Regions:
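Asp-box/BNR beta-propeller blade signature and adjacent active/binding-site loops
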Residues: 2-412
Length: 412
Protein backbone atom coordinates (compact mmCIF):
# COMPACT_ATOMS: atom_id res chain seq x y z
CA UNK A 1 0.00 0.00 0.00
CA UNK A 2 1.32 3.42 -0.89
CA UNK A 3 1.55 6.02 1.83
CA UNK A 4 1.83 9.80 1.81
CA UNK A 5 1.30 11.58 -1.49
CA UNK A 6 2.00 10.45 -5.02
CA UNK A 7 1.44 12.00 -8.40
CA UNK A 8 -0.90 10.34 -10.87
CA UNK A 9 -0.85 10.26 -14.62
CA UNK A 10 -2.10 13.00 -16.91
CA UNK A 11 -4.09 12.39 -20.11
CA UNK A 12 -2.38 12.29 -23.47
CA UNK A 13 -2.12 15.67 -25.16
CA UNK A 14 -1.40 14.19 -28.56
CA UNK A 15 -3.85 11.33 -28.58
CA UNK A 16 -0.93 8.89 -28.60
CA UNK A 17 -2.20 5.85 -26.75
CA UNK A 18 1.29 4.78 -25.79
CA UNK A 19 1.68 7.81 -23.48
CA UNK A 20 -1.09 6.85 -21.07
CA UNK A 21 -0.03 5.16 -17.85
CA UNK A 22 -1.75 3.75 -14.78
CA UNK A 23 -1.31 4.83 -11.16
CA UNK A 24 -1.77 2.12 -8.53
CA UNK A 25 -4.07 3.35 -5.74
CA UNK A 26 -4.78 0.09 -3.90
CA UNK A 27 -2.47 -2.94 -4.03
CA UNK A 28 -2.75 -6.44 -2.61
CA UNK A 29 -0.58 -6.82 0.48
CA UNK A 30 1.72 -9.68 1.47
CA UNK A 31 -0.51 -10.62 4.40
CA UNK A 32 -3.39 -11.34 2.03
CA UNK A 33 -5.28 -8.05 2.39
CA UNK A 34 -6.97 -7.42 -0.95
CA UNK A 35 -8.76 -4.37 -2.36
CA UNK A 36 -11.74 -4.89 -4.63
CA UNK A 37 -14.88 -3.25 -6.06
CA UNK A 38 -13.76 0.28 -7.08
CA UNK A 39 -15.99 3.36 -7.19
CA UNK A 40 -14.94 6.81 -8.39
CA UNK A 41 -16.46 10.28 -8.17
CA UNK A 42 -15.10 13.61 -9.42
CA UNK A 43 -16.08 16.75 -7.49
CA UNK A 44 -15.88 19.46 -10.12
CA UNK A 45 -16.11 22.48 -7.82
CA UNK A 46 -12.99 21.51 -5.86
CA UNK A 47 -11.11 19.59 -8.57
CA UNK A 48 -11.05 16.46 -6.42
CA UNK A 49 -11.32 12.75 -7.11
CA UNK A 50 -12.53 10.38 -4.41
CA UNK A 51 -11.63 6.74 -5.01
CA UNK A 52 -13.41 4.07 -2.94
CA UNK A 53 -12.87 0.32 -2.57
CA UNK A 54 -13.59 -2.62 -0.30
CA UNK A 55 -10.79 -3.72 2.01
CA UNK A 56 -10.81 -7.50 2.45
CA UNK A 57 -8.65 -9.92 4.43
CA UNK A 58 -8.71 -12.23 1.38
CA UNK A 59 -10.16 -12.05 -2.15
CA UNK A 60 -13.37 -13.76 -0.94
CA UNK A 61 -16.62 -11.78 -0.69
CA UNK A 62 -17.05 -13.22 2.81
CA UNK A 63 -13.85 -11.51 3.94
CA UNK A 64 -14.87 -7.95 3.05
CA UNK A 65 -14.38 -5.77 6.14
CA UNK A 66 -14.56 -2.03 5.56
CA UNK A 67 -14.57 0.62 2.84
CA UNK A 68 -11.44 2.67 2.17
CA UNK A 69 -11.00 5.97 0.33
CA UNK A 70 -8.21 7.93 -1.31
CA UNK A 71 -8.43 11.63 -2.19
CA UNK A 72 -6.87 12.90 -5.40
CA UNK A 73 -6.33 16.59 -6.17
CA UNK A 74 -6.26 17.53 -9.87
CA UNK A 75 -3.38 19.91 -10.56
CA UNK A 76 -3.10 22.59 -13.26
CA UNK A 77 -0.69 20.44 -15.25
CA UNK A 78 -3.23 17.60 -15.38
CA UNK A 79 -1.54 15.35 -12.84
CA UNK A 80 -3.37 14.07 -9.78
CA UNK A 81 -1.84 14.21 -6.30
CA UNK A 82 -3.13 11.36 -4.16
CA UNK A 83 -3.33 11.36 -0.37
CA UNK A 84 -2.87 8.15 1.60
CA UNK A 85 -5.66 5.64 2.08
CA UNK A 86 -8.13 6.09 4.94
CA UNK A 87 -10.69 3.70 6.38
CA UNK A 88 -14.30 4.87 6.41
CA UNK A 89 -15.11 3.92 9.97
CA UNK A 90 -18.57 5.52 10.04
CA UNK A 91 -19.71 3.46 7.03
CA UNK A 92 -20.27 0.32 9.07
CA UNK A 93 -22.49 -1.50 11.55
CA UNK A 94 -21.37 -3.96 14.27
CA UNK A 95 -21.28 -7.61 13.14
CA UNK A 96 -21.83 -6.65 9.50
CA UNK A 97 -19.36 -6.46 6.63
CA UNK A 98 -19.46 -3.39 4.38
CA UNK A 99 -19.59 -3.84 0.59
CA UNK A 100 -20.46 -2.30 -2.80
CA UNK A 101 -19.59 1.43 -2.63
CA UNK A 102 -21.85 3.66 -4.75
CA UNK A 103 -21.25 7.44 -4.48
CA UNK A 104 -23.46 10.19 -5.93
CA UNK A 105 -22.97 13.96 -5.62
CA UNK A 106 -25.94 16.30 -5.13
CA UNK A 107 -24.88 19.55 -6.81
CA UNK A 108 -27.40 21.97 -5.26
CA UNK A 109 -26.46 21.35 -1.63
CA UNK A 110 -22.99 20.04 -2.46
CA UNK A 111 -23.73 16.90 -0.49
CA UNK A 112 -21.94 13.67 -1.30
CA UNK A 113 -23.92 10.50 -0.59
CA UNK A 114 -22.15 7.16 -0.36
CA UNK A 115 -24.48 4.18 -0.57
CA UNK A 116 -23.33 0.68 0.31
CA UNK A 117 -24.66 -2.59 1.70
CA UNK A 118 -23.95 -4.27 5.02
CA UNK A 119 -24.16 -8.08 5.13
CA UNK A 120 -24.58 -9.98 8.38
CA UNK A 121 -21.43 -11.86 9.48
CA UNK A 122 -20.01 -14.09 6.78
CA UNK A 123 -23.36 -14.94 5.17
CA UNK A 124 -22.82 -15.59 1.47
CA UNK A 125 -24.93 -14.41 -1.43
CA UNK A 126 -25.49 -18.06 -2.37
CA UNK A 127 -26.81 -18.96 1.08
CA UNK A 128 -29.29 -16.08 1.00
CA UNK A 129 -30.52 -17.20 -2.42
CA UNK A 130 -30.91 -20.83 -1.30
CA UNK A 131 -32.64 -20.11 2.02
CA UNK A 132 -34.54 -17.02 0.93
CA UNK A 133 -33.47 -15.33 4.16
CA UNK A 134 -32.14 -11.85 3.50
CA UNK A 135 -29.19 -10.78 5.65
CA UNK A 136 -28.38 -7.57 3.77
CA UNK A 137 -29.10 -3.95 4.71
CA UNK A 138 -29.27 -0.82 2.52
CA UNK A 139 -27.04 1.83 4.08
CA UNK A 140 -25.77 5.34 3.43
CA UNK A 141 -23.39 7.96 4.80
CA UNK A 142 -23.11 11.56 3.61
CA UNK A 143 -20.57 14.36 3.58
CA UNK A 144 -21.07 18.11 3.27
CA UNK A 145 -17.35 18.92 3.13
CA UNK A 146 -16.25 16.99 0.05
CA UNK A 147 -15.49 13.77 1.87
CA UNK A 148 -13.30 15.15 4.66
CA UNK A 149 -15.83 14.05 7.29
CA UNK A 150 -18.77 11.66 7.10
CA UNK A 151 -22.08 11.28 8.91
CA UNK A 152 -22.93 8.17 10.93
CA UNK A 153 -24.35 5.34 8.83
CA UNK A 154 -28.11 5.28 8.21
CA UNK A 155 -30.00 2.03 7.62
CA UNK A 156 -32.53 2.76 4.86
CA UNK A 157 -33.80 -0.80 4.41
CA UNK A 158 -37.19 -0.34 6.04
CA UNK A 159 -37.95 3.11 4.64
CA UNK A 160 -36.94 2.31 1.05
CA UNK A 161 -37.63 -1.41 0.58
CA UNK A 162 -40.17 -2.08 3.33
CA UNK A 163 -42.16 -5.32 3.19
CA UNK A 164 -40.82 -6.05 -0.29
CA UNK A 165 -37.64 -7.24 1.42
CA UNK A 166 -39.38 -10.59 2.02
CA UNK A 167 -39.40 -11.14 -1.75
CA UNK A 168 -35.70 -10.34 -2.03
CA UNK A 169 -33.21 -13.11 -1.23
CA UNK A 170 -30.48 -10.48 -1.23
CA UNK A 171 -29.55 -7.28 -3.05
CA UNK A 172 -26.81 -4.71 -3.59
CA UNK A 173 -26.19 -1.26 -5.02
CA UNK A 174 -24.01 -0.55 -8.05
CA UNK A 175 -21.25 -1.08 -7.52
CA UNK A 176 -19.82 2.12 -8.97
CA UNK A 177 -21.11 5.67 -9.25
CA UNK A 178 -24.68 6.96 -9.14
CA UNK A 179 -25.94 9.93 -11.16
CA UNK A 180 -27.89 13.17 -10.72
CA UNK A 181 -30.28 13.88 -13.59
CA UNK A 182 -30.88 17.31 -15.11
CA UNK A 183 -34.20 17.51 -13.26
CA UNK A 184 -32.32 17.08 -9.96
CA UNK A 185 -33.34 13.49 -9.27
CA UNK A 186 -30.63 11.34 -7.70
CA UNK A 187 -30.22 7.80 -9.04
CA UNK A 188 -28.56 4.86 -7.28
CA UNK A 189 -28.27 1.76 -9.50
CA UNK A 190 -29.19 -1.44 -7.69
CA UNK A 191 -30.20 -5.06 -8.20
CA UNK A 192 -31.97 -7.78 -6.25
CA UNK A 193 -32.23 -11.55 -6.35
CA UNK A 194 -36.00 -11.74 -6.59
CA UNK A 195 -37.90 -14.69 -5.09
CA UNK A 196 -40.67 -15.43 -7.56
CA UNK A 197 -41.89 -18.71 -6.05
CA UNK A 198 -41.57 -20.42 -2.66
CA UNK A 199 -42.35 -23.94 -1.47
CA UNK A 200 -42.47 -24.68 2.27
CA UNK A 201 -40.99 -21.20 2.89
CA UNK A 202 -37.93 -21.92 0.70
CA UNK A 203 -37.36 -20.46 -2.76
CA UNK A 204 -37.92 -22.94 -5.58
CA UNK A 205 -34.44 -23.77 -6.97
CA UNK A 206 -33.31 -21.93 -10.11
CA UNK A 207 -36.16 -19.41 -9.91
CA UNK A 208 -34.27 -16.81 -7.86
CA UNK A 209 -32.82 -14.54 -10.54
CA UNK A 210 -31.24 -11.07 -10.41
CA UNK A 211 -33.17 -8.01 -11.53
CA UNK A 212 -31.79 -4.48 -11.85
CA UNK A 213 -33.68 -1.42 -10.61
CA UNK A 214 -33.06 2.13 -9.45
CA UNK A 215 -33.23 3.71 -6.01
CA UNK A 216 -34.01 7.39 -6.42
CA UNK A 217 -34.60 10.64 -4.56
CA UNK A 218 -36.78 13.51 -5.76
CA UNK A 219 -35.90 15.86 -2.87
CA UNK A 220 -32.10 16.07 -3.17
CA UNK A 221 -31.44 13.09 -0.93
CA UNK A 222 -33.86 13.74 1.94
CA UNK A 223 -35.98 10.66 1.15
CA UNK A 224 -35.41 7.68 -1.12
CA UNK A 225 -37.67 5.34 -3.11
CA UNK A 226 -37.21 2.23 -5.21
CA UNK A 227 -38.24 1.81 -8.82
CA UNK A 228 -39.61 -1.30 -10.52
CA UNK A 229 -37.37 -4.18 -11.53
CA UNK A 230 -36.31 -4.79 -15.10
CA UNK A 231 -38.35 -7.53 -16.75
CA UNK A 232 -35.24 -9.46 -17.76
CA UNK A 233 -32.33 -11.12 -15.96
CA UNK A 234 -29.96 -8.30 -15.02
CA UNK A 235 -27.44 -8.06 -12.21
CA UNK A 236 -24.81 -5.47 -11.19
CA UNK A 237 -25.53 -2.28 -13.09
CA UNK A 238 -24.77 1.37 -13.71
CA UNK A 239 -26.97 4.07 -15.21
CA UNK A 240 -26.49 7.21 -17.29
CA UNK A 241 -28.73 10.05 -18.47
CA UNK A 242 -29.15 10.56 -22.22
CA UNK A 243 -30.50 13.90 -23.51
CA UNK A 244 -31.97 13.66 -27.00
CA UNK A 245 -31.97 16.39 -29.68
CA UNK A 246 -35.27 17.78 -28.34
CA UNK A 247 -33.93 18.06 -24.79
CA UNK A 248 -35.84 15.07 -23.42
CA UNK A 249 -34.24 12.90 -20.75
CA UNK A 250 -33.83 9.13 -21.00
CA UNK A 251 -32.24 7.06 -18.23
CA UNK A 252 -30.06 4.28 -19.61
CA UNK A 253 -29.30 1.10 -17.65
CA UNK A 254 -26.40 -1.22 -18.49
CA UNK A 255 -26.41 -4.44 -16.43
CA UNK A 256 -24.33 -7.56 -15.96
CA UNK A 257 -25.70 -10.66 -17.64
CA UNK A 258 -24.45 -13.91 -19.14
CA UNK A 259 -22.99 -13.83 -22.66
CA UNK A 260 -23.95 -10.23 -23.46
CA UNK A 261 -24.77 -7.11 -21.46
CA UNK A 262 -28.39 -6.21 -20.73
CA UNK A 263 -29.61 -2.72 -21.70
CA UNK A 264 -32.83 -0.84 -20.96
CA UNK A 265 -34.22 2.71 -21.13
CA UNK A 266 -36.49 4.55 -18.70
CA UNK A 267 -38.64 7.45 -19.89
CA UNK A 268 -39.69 8.40 -16.34
CA UNK A 269 -36.34 8.96 -14.64
CA UNK A 270 -35.92 5.45 -13.29
CA UNK A 271 -39.39 4.55 -12.00
CA UNK A 272 -39.40 1.65 -14.46
CA UNK A 273 -37.46 0.56 -17.54
CA UNK A 274 -38.98 -0.47 -20.88
CA UNK A 275 -38.00 -3.34 -23.18
CA UNK A 276 -34.75 -4.65 -21.68
CA UNK A 277 -32.65 -6.41 -24.30
CA UNK A 278 -29.17 -7.85 -24.84
CA UNK A 279 -26.46 -5.71 -26.43
CA UNK A 280 -24.61 -8.07 -28.76
CA UNK A 281 -21.74 -5.61 -29.26
CA UNK A 282 -20.99 -5.79 -25.51
CA UNK A 283 -19.76 -9.29 -24.74
CA UNK A 284 -19.81 -10.90 -21.30
CA UNK A 285 -18.00 -13.87 -19.87
CA UNK A 286 -20.18 -16.89 -19.01
CA UNK A 287 -20.74 -15.67 -15.45
CA UNK A 288 -20.47 -12.02 -16.40
CA UNK A 289 -18.57 -9.15 -14.80
CA UNK A 290 -19.43 -5.71 -13.51
CA UNK A 291 -18.96 -2.85 -15.98
CA UNK A 292 -19.12 0.95 -15.88
CA UNK A 293 -21.02 3.39 -18.09
CA UNK A 294 -21.07 7.17 -18.16
CA UNK A 295 -22.83 9.81 -20.26
CA UNK A 296 -21.15 12.99 -21.50
CA UNK A 297 -22.01 15.92 -23.83
CA UNK A 298 -21.63 14.96 -27.48
CA UNK A 299 -18.85 17.07 -29.03
CA UNK A 300 -19.48 19.15 -32.13
CA UNK A 301 -16.04 18.14 -33.36
CA UNK A 302 -12.85 16.50 -32.17
CA UNK A 303 -9.67 18.40 -33.16
CA UNK A 304 -7.24 16.62 -35.44
CA UNK A 305 -3.83 15.83 -34.01
CA UNK A 306 -1.72 17.97 -36.32
CA UNK A 307 -1.50 21.65 -35.42
CA UNK A 308 -2.40 22.93 -38.92
CA UNK A 309 -5.77 21.18 -38.96
CA UNK A 310 -6.83 21.71 -35.35
CA UNK A 311 -8.92 24.74 -36.25
CA UNK A 312 -11.33 22.71 -38.34
CA UNK A 313 -11.20 19.27 -36.75
CA UNK A 314 -13.59 16.47 -37.59
CA UNK A 315 -17.35 17.05 -37.39
CA UNK A 316 -19.02 14.59 -35.02
CA UNK A 317 -22.34 16.22 -34.20
CA UNK A 318 -24.87 13.48 -33.49
CA UNK A 319 -28.19 13.82 -35.34
CA UNK A 320 -30.40 12.34 -32.61
CA UNK A 321 -28.84 13.00 -29.20
CA UNK A 322 -26.90 15.55 -27.20
CA UNK A 323 -25.25 12.76 -25.19
CA UNK A 324 -22.74 10.04 -25.97
CA UNK A 325 -21.99 7.03 -23.79
CA UNK A 326 -18.71 5.44 -22.74
CA UNK A 327 -18.69 1.88 -21.39
CA UNK A 328 -15.81 0.02 -19.69
CA UNK A 329 -15.59 -3.76 -19.33
CA UNK A 330 -13.26 -6.74 -19.97
CA UNK A 331 -13.44 -7.54 -23.69
CA UNK A 332 -12.41 -11.21 -23.62
CA UNK A 333 -15.38 -13.55 -24.09
CA UNK A 334 -13.99 -16.43 -22.05
CA UNK A 335 -12.25 -14.80 -19.07
CA UNK A 336 -11.84 -11.49 -17.28
CA UNK A 337 -9.07 -10.06 -19.45
CA UNK A 338 -8.24 -7.12 -21.70
CA UNK A 339 -10.11 -4.16 -20.25
CA UNK A 340 -11.68 -2.07 -23.00
CA UNK A 341 -13.57 1.15 -23.64
CA UNK A 342 -16.63 1.17 -25.91
CA UNK A 343 -17.97 4.43 -27.37
CA UNK A 344 -21.63 4.91 -28.36
CA UNK A 345 -22.39 7.98 -30.50
CA UNK A 346 -26.07 7.03 -30.97
CA UNK A 347 -27.04 5.75 -27.51
CA UNK A 348 -30.77 5.60 -28.24
CA UNK A 349 -29.96 2.78 -30.67
CA UNK A 350 -28.80 -0.54 -29.24
CA UNK A 351 -26.40 -1.16 -32.14
CA UNK A 352 -24.52 2.10 -31.69
CA UNK A 353 -21.43 0.72 -29.93
CA UNK A 354 -18.02 1.03 -31.57
CA UNK A 355 -15.41 -1.68 -31.25
CA UNK A 356 -13.49 -1.38 -27.97
CA UNK A 357 -10.14 0.30 -27.34
CA UNK A 358 -8.02 -1.83 -25.00
CA UNK A 359 -6.68 -0.02 -21.92
CA UNK A 360 -5.12 -3.01 -20.15
CA UNK A 361 -3.78 -6.19 -21.73
CA UNK A 362 -4.15 -8.98 -19.22
CA UNK A 363 -6.33 -9.83 -16.22
CA UNK A 364 -9.04 -7.20 -15.67
CA UNK A 365 -12.11 -7.00 -13.46
CA UNK A 366 -14.44 -4.38 -12.00
CA UNK A 367 -14.12 -0.71 -12.97
CA UNK A 368 -15.68 2.73 -12.62
CA UNK A 369 -15.65 5.81 -14.87
CA UNK A 370 -15.80 9.54 -14.09
CA UNK A 371 -16.02 12.59 -16.39
CA UNK A 372 -14.44 16.02 -15.92
CA UNK A 373 -16.51 18.50 -17.92
CA UNK A 374 -14.08 21.38 -17.41
CA UNK A 375 -11.30 19.62 -19.29
CA UNK A 376 -13.38 17.15 -21.34
CA UNK A 377 -11.41 14.32 -19.77
CA UNK A 378 -12.32 10.89 -18.49
CA UNK A 379 -10.82 9.02 -15.57
CA UNK A 380 -11.28 5.47 -14.38
CA UNK A 381 -10.50 2.98 -11.67
CA UNK A 382 -9.99 -0.63 -12.65
CA UNK A 383 -9.06 -3.93 -11.09
CA UNK A 384 -6.07 -5.26 -13.02
CA UNK A 385 -2.76 -7.07 -12.78
CA UNK A 386 -0.20 -9.25 -14.53
CA UNK A 387 -1.29 -12.63 -13.17
CA UNK A 388 -4.64 -11.74 -11.56
CA UNK A 389 -7.10 -8.87 -11.65
CA UNK A 390 -7.03 -8.94 -7.84
CA UNK A 391 -3.48 -7.56 -7.69
CA UNK A 392 -4.35 -3.87 -7.73
CA UNK A 393 -6.87 -1.11 -8.37
CA UNK A 394 -5.37 1.46 -10.74
CA UNK A 395 -6.32 4.99 -11.83
CA UNK A 396 -5.98 6.37 -15.34
CA UNK A 397 -7.06 9.52 -17.21
CA UNK A 398 -7.60 9.98 -20.95
CA UNK A 399 -9.45 12.10 -23.52
CA UNK A 400 -12.15 11.34 -26.07
CA UNK A 401 -9.51 11.69 -28.77
CA UNK A 402 -7.57 8.91 -27.05
CA UNK A 403 -10.64 6.67 -27.10
CA UNK A 404 -11.16 7.28 -30.82
CA UNK A 405 -7.58 6.44 -31.81
CA UNK A 406 -7.25 3.48 -34.14
CA UNK A 407 -4.14 2.04 -32.49
CA UNK A 408 -3.99 -1.21 -30.57
CA UNK A 409 -4.04 -0.15 -26.94
CA UNK A 410 -3.48 2.68 -24.50
CA UNK A 411 -1.10 0.77 -22.28
CA UNK A 412 0.37 -2.70 -22.19
Amino acid sequence: MESGFNMGNSPSKTGNAEELVKTTLFERERNGITYRIPALVYLRHCHTFLAFAEKRTSPSDCDAKILVMRRGTLKEDGTVQWASSEEMTTASFPNYRTMSPCPVFEKNSRTLFLFFICVRGNTTERKQCITGKNRTRLCCVSSSDDGHTWSPATDLTESVIGETIHKWATFAVGPGHGVQLENGRLIIPAYTYYIKYRCCSYPIPFTVLPRALSIYSEDFGQTWHMGKMLGKKSCECEMAEIIDHEGRSHLYCNARNSGYRCEALSENSGVYFDKPHVARELVEQRCGCQGSVIGFPAPEFVPNDDAESKACGTSLLSPDTQTWLLFMHPTNKSSRRDMGLYLNRSPLHSSGWDKPRIVHRGPSGYSDLAYNGDKDQFSCLMECGKESELEQISFMSFTLNDVMQTGNAFCL
